[in-house]
């Protein structure tokens, strides 16, 4: 899938995802159920991957 965003849109989306990431870390820390924590950690890894790719794309866009 291709999605074209302006730099400002990328910054907004990254900020929203970073906030969710911080919330997710807190949620993981307060979760006692092993399987649920495992699921949250999987979501955290996916979110980190998305943020990383979003940032890379933003840097490439600035260089262009």
Regions found by a protein language model. Give the residues of each.
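Short, charge-rich amphipathic interface segments used for partner binding and complex assembly
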Residues: 30, 34-61
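Terminal, compositionally biased segments
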Residues: 1, 63-64
């Amino acid at each position: 899938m291709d999605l074209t965003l302006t730099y400002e849109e990328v910054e907004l989306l990254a900020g929203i995802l970073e906030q969710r990431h911080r919330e997710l870390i807190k949620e993981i820390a307060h979760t006692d159920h092993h399987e649920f924590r495992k699921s949250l950690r999987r979501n955290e890894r996916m979110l980190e991957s998305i943020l990383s790719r979003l940032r890379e794309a933003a840097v490439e866009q600035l260089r262009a």
